[in-house]
């Protein structure tokens, strides 16, 4: 049965064909710096890239070697991908003989000691970022923090929100309406994100060095030497127990049925001590190895496949920003770096994501119960580990059904929103993107995870050799790519500006670190 909001969107779009032309997007792409031999770079953040603390487009994530590239908000896919390509080209001018690792799961690593924590200078905000990362390392191990991914930021056009709100009666505030609709999108995303893992998962194997000394896994050796560990039908080990995962957080029941519950759950996790973390110093005698001894140091520590977001003011917590203004956009966090695309993702993926997320927004989205969430978690874990297994079934309404059938039905619904996007733009690009995903459902060998394993097996490549092949291929691609003079000048200017901004921050500090942290955490208490 067609949902009210699907019918509404089709009716509104028919009367206003350009209603969906202004989708706002942004991409955050992480990449490890590596040596020519495929080992994790031990060098500091390249000076030519400016300050990782204050640069608008180039920063670091957990490790000094884990670069993160950020595109500005844009309504054009070509503009977003073009900007991301320019950032890559610029970065390669500063890397010397280093390369960017073309996979999500890390290259050759020598344990936690071989993963340098990111440094941001001497200001309070810089120290807070580094101490937070030290805490993550103590709590989960540094190895998990060396995993790279792609985050996709999405928000429908303002014209859409205004038209939908008015059509639904304009009851209450428009922002409350928008927030409630985003929460519905998030609940449906949790119901169907397994499909994204199947279609775009690109981490079915890992380098054996990633699991050295660990016995808590059931991966199989892929080669006689045991250099590569894998699961034959896995899609995205990054999204499972070996990747971004936390046993301690399993009991954290985050509710997306209303914003108040979401904020309260995370606030309590940030302010309530967690006995297992009391062993790590959090300010005693001025020694900081973590920001606090709570279940979460800050809200970013909560691992999730999607986040509700609002741009925060300087010094403002993410939760405070959401309380202040409601949800402004969502951040999809379950995308692996695609080794077969120079940028790690491509236009087809973005067009499908737009159609998928719009589908999540306009389908009915009843409140989610803990029992349903447990089923959804099981479905996701099943697809992570066994997504391409012949005859695989998932839990659906009315019992277990084949993944292929559930995926086919979901893609039919996504094709309807793709058709509306195509009508708005006067082309067939979104429907073509959906058709490409339908082909992956019909033939599992067309998925990135299957293509990776097939190439590794055919050419006798261990994981790190496969990663080096594509890392070197894309390094050559970006080193030979022309970077327009205005783009080069803008990035060089931003690097210089960021260094000056860091110096100004360091000179402007007036509080000691303990007082700075106390003032920051007062925001959570006030939520």
Identify what each model region corresponds to:
Residues 121-138, 146, 155-322, 342, ...:
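Loop-rich catalytic cores of soluble enzymes, especially ATP-dependent carboxylate-amine ligases
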Residues 42-45, 81, 114, 164-165, ...:
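Short conserved micro-motifs at the rims of enzyme active sites and ligand-binding pockets
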């Amino acid at each position: 049965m067609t949902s009210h909001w699907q019918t509404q969107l089709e009716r509104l779009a028919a009367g206003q064909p350009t209603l969906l032309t202004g989708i706002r997007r942004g991409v955050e792409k992480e990449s490890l710096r590596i040596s020519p031999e495929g080992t994790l770079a031990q060098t500091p953040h390249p000076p030519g890239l400016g300050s990782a603390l204050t640069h608008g487009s180039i920063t670091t994530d957990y490790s000094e070697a884990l670069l993160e590239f950020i595109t500005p908000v844009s309504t054009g896919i070509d503009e977003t991908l073009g900007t991301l390509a320019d950032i890559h080209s610029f970065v390669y001018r500063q890397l010397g003989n280093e390369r960017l690792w073309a996979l999500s799961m890390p290259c050759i690593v020598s344990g936690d000691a071989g993963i340098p924590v990111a440094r941001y200078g001497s200001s309070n905000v810089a120290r807070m970022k580094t101490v937070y990362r030290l805490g993550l390392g103590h709590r989960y191990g540094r190895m998990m923090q060396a995993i790279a991914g792609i985050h996709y930021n999405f928000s429908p056009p303002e014209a859409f929100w205004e038209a939908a709100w008015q059509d639904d009666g304009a009851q209450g505030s428009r922002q409350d309406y928008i927030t409630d609709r985003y929460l519905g999108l998030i609940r449906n995303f949790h119901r169907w994100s397994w499909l994204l893992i199947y279609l775009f998962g690109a981490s079915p194997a890992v380098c054996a060095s990633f699991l050295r000394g660990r016995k808590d896994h059931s991966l199989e050796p892929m080669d006689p030497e045991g250099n590569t560990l894998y699961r034959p039908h896995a899609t995205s080990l990054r999204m499972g127990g070996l990747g971004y995962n936390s046993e301690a957080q399993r009991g954290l029941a985050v509710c997306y049925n209303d914003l108040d519950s979401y904020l309260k759950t995370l606030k309590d996790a940030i302010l309530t001590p967690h006995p297992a973390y009391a062993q790590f110093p959090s300010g005693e005698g001025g020694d900081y190895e973590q920001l606090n001894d709570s279940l979460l140091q800050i809200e970013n520590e909560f691992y999730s496949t999607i986040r509700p977001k609002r741009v925060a003011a300087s010094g403002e917590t993410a939760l405070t920003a959401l309380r202040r203004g409601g949800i402004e956009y969502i951040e999809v966090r379950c995308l692996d770096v695609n080794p077969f695309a120079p940028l790690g993702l491509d236009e087809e993926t973005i067009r499908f994501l737009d159609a998928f997320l719009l589908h999540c927004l306009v389908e009915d989205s009843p409140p989610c119960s803990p029992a349903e969430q447990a089923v959804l978690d099981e479905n996701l874990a099943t697809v992570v580990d066994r997504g391409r297994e012949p005859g695989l079934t998932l839990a659906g309404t009315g019992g277990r059904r084949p993944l292929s059938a559930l995926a086919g039905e979901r893609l039919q619904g996504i094709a309807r929103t793709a058709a509306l996007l195509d009508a708005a733009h006067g082309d067939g690009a979104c429907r073509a993107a959906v058709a490409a995903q339908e082909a992956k459902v019909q033939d599992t060998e067309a998925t990135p995870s299957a293509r990776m394993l097939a190439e590794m097996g055919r050419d006798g490549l261990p994981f790190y050799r496969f990663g080096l092949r594509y890392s070197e291929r894309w390094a050559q691609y970006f080193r030979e790519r022309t970077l327009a003079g205005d783009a080069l000048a803008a990035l060089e200017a931003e690097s210089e500006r960021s260094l000056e901004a860091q110096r100004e921050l360091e000179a402007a500090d007036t509080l000691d670190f303990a007082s700075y942290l106390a003032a920051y955490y007062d925001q959570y208490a006030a939520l």
